[in-house]
Amino acid sequence: MADEGKSYNEHDDRVSFPQRRKKGRGPFRWKCGEGNRRSGRGGSGVQSSRFEEDDGDVAMNDPQDGPRVRYNPYTNRPNRRGDGWHDRDRIHITVRRDRAPAERGGAGTSQDGTTKNWFKITIPYGRKYDKTWLLSMIQSKCSVPFNPIEFHYENTRAHFFVEDATTASALKGVNHKIQDRENRRISIIINASAPPYTVQNELKPEQIEQLKLIMSKRYDGNQQALDLKGLRSDPDLVAQNIDVVLNRRSCMAATLRIIEENIPELLSLNLSSNRLYKLDDMSSIVQKAPNLKTLNLSGNELKTERELDKIKGLKLEELWLDRNPMCDNFGDQSSYISAIRERFPKLLRLDGHELPPPISFDVEAPTMLPPCKGSYFGTENLKSLVLRFLQQYYVIYDSGDRQGLLYAYHDGACCSLSIPYNPQNPVRKNLAEYVKDSRNVKKLKEPTQRFRLLKHTRLNVVAFLNELPKTQHDVNAFVVDISAQTSTLLCFSVNGVFKEVDGKSRDSLRAFTRTFIAVPASNSGLCIVNDELFVRNASPEEIQRAFAMSAPTPSSSPVPTLSPEQQEMLQAFSTQSGMNLEWSQKCLQDNNWDYTRSAQAFTLLKAKGEIPEVAFMK
């Protein structure tokens, strides 16, 4: 880049982003002509319209207001024709009769040249509902999965867009099916719409490749610092007529995706002078650049310190905020520092000034987690019920044919699987068979994908379980906790280990946590209505302990060949330890019928939580 384009890091030893191995895609290289395969849909190219005149302020057409009215979430707007009829206690789902029919929609063109119909969804009084709750409730009642585009609040309403007539028609079917906590019915108004603004302005794959190249020129590998100051006016972008405005959601998303894929170890980022007036679209940087220590947001349009709440998950040590309107909100320096440190307690420098050391109550000495206390059942009746259920369940689960589990699940049961997600430590190869079905909500942000990976009805649940690797569980080492119980419902979790017995990962040991919600069954047993399974690689300690304590062969009485003295010792040991006769005999035999040694071994193993619950079932 020309000398006049340099800023923030003035040196001549600029390097490209380090080569990184993508997931299954070989090493990363900077290739301008190669399309970005993860870029998603594209939109129009450079905008030579009024959006350039306002230097990147986001505008969006509202189909209710006509094509000339700009979307501005901060202005009060009068009610328009048709809005006044709503009764707050009776809300309906309606398609406006003075607009285009829902089946026709507003036309838009995708990158591949196909035409798409767009619809704007409006929820009157939607502002009083949490976004996650509102979308999940609509999705639960909608007959097809949908992807809400550009969800936002405007005055008292909530809005989002969908991109096809089938989805719009399905949303019409949600009429009178959702009620809030005050038993008010929630309506959905559907209008044909032009494509949402951010979709129109998505960068094309070739533009993303150019942006990637320019970001590589602005990256200092020695300092792990990326300088995106005044990115829109970058000479190379201007020369190629590419308009990258970081206060547009599509541009910020493309930029953060490039960072995530190529330099997630980034330590310093300069976003000064980019006309940023909100940080909603930047919130994912917490996951995409978790090591970030220095952030420069100076010379932007941030009006309130509350915008920083969107990124307060960053462990920042240095932050620049000068020349933002928010700086004028504070009467003195101490209140300014206090407000910022409330969001970033480890901050050492603000606007270039050293801060006094943060007050910390962190315990420097290493602390040990308390030892596991073993299972908790509440009552002996519940203990007997749950242990009997688990023994029957895992006999079938480990048999190789899990079809028999159909009788363990309710007709409307649901089930999900998840595996660990850590951006700094990607899933290792030996968990590959679980990746495609993992519903880890820390990784999956799209409601559509979350919905798809939730298995509904007992037929689908058991079909899904049949596809998982064949297993052998260490039932004797299960730790069971009952967390909730009513007369009609029981919630309990199971922790343990299992071994895969076939396939590429044969003999691999896994640890798992499984949470069951069950209701009473007609046979005095349990019927599962909800099943959540979490699988991870077993730790070295878990591998060492696994299958170490095999269950003795059950019998109703002591072995007949025992001497009278041994039988008397066995009865006494069973009474004092609380274990049944089979496990008491095993303990005595393992210690050569030395009563004192047996008692000491029992006390030690019980303190470590290594005696299974079945040992106490009589």
Curated annotation (Swiss-Prot):
A Pfam family assignment: TAP_C
> At what positions is Asymmetric dimethylarginine found?
41
The segment(s) forming the NTF2 domain are 385-535
Where located? Nucleus, Nucleoplasm; Nucleus speckle; Cytoplasm; Nucleus, Nuclear pore complex
Start and end residues of each RRM domain: 118-197
Residue spans of biased composition, Basic and acidic residues class: 1-15, 80-102
PTM annotation (3'-nitrotyrosine): residues = 125
Annotated spans, Major non-specific RNA-binding: 60-117
* Omega-N-methylarginine modifications at: 41
User: GO: which molecular function terms?
Assistant: mRNA binding; RNA binding
Q: Region RNA-binding (RBD): which residues?
A: 2-117
Which residue ranges are recorded for the region named RNA binding?
60-117
Q: Which GO terms describe its cellular component?
A: cytoplasm; cytoplasmic stress granule; nuclear inclusion body; nuclear pore; nuclear RNA export factor complex; nuclear speck; nucleus; transcription export complex
Motif Nuclear export signal: residue span?
A: 82-109
UniProt keywords (A-Z) are: Acetylation, Cytoplasm, Leucine-rich repeat, Methylation, mRNA transport, Nitration, Nuclear pore complex, Nucleus, Protein transport, Repeat, RNA-binding, Translocation, Transport
Question: What are the boundaries of the region Interaction with ALYREF/THOC4 and LUZP4?
Answer: 2-197
Q: Which GO terms describe its biological process?
A: poly(A)+ mRNA export from nucleus; protein transport; RNA export from nucleus
Q: Does the keyword Metal-binding apply?
A: no
Domain TAP-C: residue ranges: 564-618
The primary location reported for this protein is: nucleus
Question: Its quaternary structure?
Answer: Heterodimer (via NTF2 domain) with NXT1. The formation of NXF1-NXT1 heterodimers is required for the NXF1-mediated nuclear mRNA export. Forms a complex with RANBP2/NUP358, NXT1 and RANGAP1. Associates with the exon junction complex (EJC). Associates with the transcription/export (TREX) complex. Found in a mRNA complex with UPF3A and UPF3B. Found in a post-splicing complex with RBM8A, UPF1, UPF2, UPF3A, UPF3B and RNPS1.
Q: Which family does it belong to?
A: Belongs to the NXF family.
- Function summary: Involved in the nuclear export of mRNA species bearing retroviral constitutive transport elements (CTE) and in the export of mRNA from the nucleus to the cytoplasm (TAP/NFX1 pathway). The NXF1-NXT1 heterodimer is involved in the export of HSP70 mRNA in conjunction with ALYREF/THOC4 and THOC5 components of the TREX complex. ALYREF/THOC4-bound mRNA is thought to be transferred to the NXF1-NXT1 heterodimer for export.
What protein am I looking at? Nuclear RNA export factor 1
Q: Organism, per UniProt? A: Mus musculus (Mouse)
